[in-house]
Amino acid sequence: MKSETLTIQQIFQNQRQYRVPFYQRAYVWTQRNQWSALLEDIFEKAQSRLSGTKPTPHFLGAVVLEPQLKNSLLGVDTIHIIDGQQRLTTLQYILASIRLSLRATGLSELEGLVLTCLKNTNEATMRNKKVECFKLWPTFRDQTHFIQSLNVDNIDDLRNVFSDSFTQHGTLRKHFNHPPSLEALWFFTEAFIKWI
């Protein structure tokens, strides 16, 4: 077993996919219990950087990973997430929200920095492009909404894909059972747009 400290970019940049094994629970993190505190930490670190102060690293917690043997030249490297799937999935939603926020605020020229951490791009090396393009592959229960959420191009697209979850004025319905991926994307995207 190897222990090391990695940045988000180091975790997600290479041509690999983190898979959530079938026995793991579905995505359950929420605004009240996890997202708000994480977002405060993100903004605090960003403000430190903008003010010229070197921020202290943020410890998101330990992640236990199990690399899988590759038995073909084709296919991205696959790593099973034994512990930490809630954190890694949340990071994917945050990165997708940053991308949507950059597009919504006219800063889409910066999205390339984020896109390399969201998608595997070298399709020539993939066995199944529709699956292997994602840096993270969730449990079966979360796959449909995860794919829909990460494939949207902008906020209007998000509203269209999840039209039942929005009012006719484009706001997220209250007291509605939204897919967790939509709730995460909407929460983080709104917050990043306000911050930008």
Q: How would you name each of these model-derived features?
A:
Residues 1-196:
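Glycine- and hydrophobic-rich flexible loops that cap the catalytic core of alpha/beta enzyme folds
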